[in-house]
Amino acid sequence: MVPVFAHLTCSSTSQVLQTLDTSQSNRLFSNCPQGAMTPGIPIFSPMMPYGTGLTPQPIQNTNSLSILEEQQRQQQQQQQQQQQQQQQQQQQAAVAAVQQSTSQQATQGPSGQTPQLFHSQTLTTAPLPGTTPLYPSPMTPMTPITPATPASESSGIVPQLQNIVSTVNLGCKLDLKTIALRARNAEYNPKRFAAVIMRIREPRTTALIFSSGKMVCTGAKSEEQSRLAARKYARVVQKLGFPAKFLDFKIQNMVGSCDVKFPIRLEGLVLTHQQFSSYEPELFPGLIYRMIKPRIVLLIFVSGKVVLTGAKVRAEIYEAFENIYPILKGFRKTT
Amino acid sequence: MASTSRLDALPRVTCPNHPDAILVEDYRAGDMICPECGLVVGDRVIDVGSEWRTFSNDKATKDPSRVGDSQNPLLSDGDLSTMIGKGTGAASFDEFGNSKYQNRRTMSSSDRAMMNAFKEITTMADRINLPRNIVDRTNNLFKQVYEQKSLKGRANDAIASACLYIACRQEGVPRTFKEICAVSRISKKEIGRCFKLILKALETSVDLITTGDFMSRFCSNLCLPKQVQMAATHIARKAVELDLVPGRSPISVAEAAIYMASQASAEKRTQKEIGDIAGVADVTIRQSYRLIYPRAPDLFPTDFKFDTPVDKLPQL
């Protein structure tokens, strides 16, 4: 079965992402309703398949980065739906006379007349809808635009963020003793460590507050939560009487984890990727893989669990996982 | 007695009749002889043997050798300096009996740390009876690391221990970290850290350890006969092939295999004994043993003589 879609791996360039971005947003709002109205011609799945109860999701996050991720993830979900749909529809293919276009954009109004095969990742300049071939079979391979490694689908697994470490400068010198005495949930042991350790319950985080006014906030599960928690700590310090500001908030480290759901042959992996891997069962049961691009350290375990750390932005974690997934699939344990 | 023939890169002397013949050196007589016709081509060749033979029970102060210790050219930076010896006559001592000229220090200040480390390496290797080739390899590794200066902040002993570990691995006879810990004052954690740093600094890598690397050493430390050792090797290898012990350290698997083999033979060993020898906790052996116990009949070699049959093996 020829995979009809050219699949986008997350290591594609940002340009690709941006063009996808714009085209996708167009499609979101133009393709769906009109395609449904055309009678008599069976419709290949547009962006939102009917009957699944899905509606185009409005973009919620304030972070511009996460918009990209959201869309990537949406694409991945849709691809899976696509493939399911495609399998169903190939059975009906003999009956259907389908007009197929090599790309699906031309997303302007009249596009609704020609139901277009949804192709999530082609970026060629769209031929005009009128020039679609008349007798395509569903098995006609699309011209892959992004070079796809054979049989590489995006894994469909999304690493979950487990910890975010961020720093912020409160901009004034602090008296740790008064903070420790007056604030709740604060501990200060100057002989052991020269900072106040403060905890808040929502979001569940811990902060180290130093006398220079700098603060480290750990334990949050998302960038927004980390920022919110840091602001809460700054407010606590402010309420204690210090002229606290919120300068240079920066996320220093992000940790994510996921499960590839199959056991992995670590010995094979260390043999082939010697310059990146370090596997010493005497020292640590997992393989430590230092990826160069993006610069992420992955801990890979025999059970199939993977921990990714060292990222400054969420996209690096996703990209690193998409890079490692085909490699791990190659070292799947067969028994 | 003819010594080994030297292959001259620039043949300065050749036999006039046989220019292609490789001359044989007879160092006792100081001759270079053509093997084809027996012509003595070069004579009065300087004897490079030692001038005197010294024995340990001779008066040690009267060592007539004028050349000193053998050089260590690969390691120290060429030891061609000389030292002023201790005085022998009465004039060299002042009124209190102290020698007047006391400068025997700072002979190689740049290499002092390195020589100290070599001494330490030799001591450590001696404790676990490592052969000279491993010690030489360790010295070489240490010299490379020391000259690179990328690990300059680390304790020299830690780097020396890690070099010893890497040398054992490279020679194909790995020692466990715990064994190196036992002869060194450095903690396992620090040795592990230095090990990873050295591999990165020298841009080398080492092979993965396998269960068979340790079998002969552990079994002979436990005084187990050869059949038990071979059986244990077979069990451990089969267990890894059948993937009964995913994610377990090869040491633990080897230990469990030794336990199973010894319990099935006449020479039984307890988990505690095996754990003491290998530096593995006996709960670890128990865990690995539980994983291989269900497939015990498949793991034994076919020609093994059971003293205790397979179904009577202890089940923990």
Curated annotation (Swiss-Prot), chain B:
Residues found modified as Phosphoserine: 70, 76, 92
Q: What are its E.C. numbers?
A: 2.3.1.48
Identify the species of origin. Bos taurus (Bovine)
Which CDD domains has this protein been placed in? CYCLIN_TFIIB_rpt1 (cd20551), CYCLIN_TFIIB_rpt2 (cd20552)
Tell me, what does this protein do in biology? General transcription factor that plays a role in transcription initiation by RNA polymerase II (Pol II). Involved in the pre-initiation complex (PIC) formation and Pol II recruitment at promoter DNA. Together with the TATA box-bound TBP forms the core initiation complex and provides a bridge between TBP and the Pol II-TFIIF complex. Released from the PIC early following the onset of transcription during the initiation and elongation transition and reassociates with TBP during the next transcription cycle. Associates with chromatin to core promoter-specific regions.
Q: What is known of its domains?
A: The TFIIB-type zinc-binding domain is necessary for the interaction and recruitment of RNA polymerase II to the core promoter, the formation of a fully competent pre-initiation complex (PIC) assembly and basal transcription initiation. The C-terminus is necessary and sufficient for interaction with the TATA box-bound TBP complex and for the formation of PIC.
Instruction: List the residue ranges of the region (Core promoter DNA-binding).
Output: 189-193, 249-252, 283-286
Q: Which family does it belong to?
A: Belongs to the TFIIB family.
Please give the superkingdom of this protein's source.
Eukaryota
Q: What is this protein called?
A: Transcription initiation factor IIB
- Catalyzed chemical reaction(s): L-lysyl-[protein] + acetyl-CoA = N(6)-acetyl-L-lysyl-[protein] + CoA + H(+)
Q: List modified residues, type N6-acetyllysine.
A: 238
User: What are the GO BP annotations of this UniProt entry?
Assistant: DNA-templated transcription initiation; protein acetylation; RNA polymerase II core complex assembly; RNA polymerase II preinitiation complex assembly; transcription by RNA polymerase II; transcription initiation at RNA polymerase II promoter; transcriptional start site selection at RNA polymerase II promoter; viral transcription
Record PTM text: Acetylated. Autoacetylated; autoacetylation at Lys-238 stimulates transcription activation.
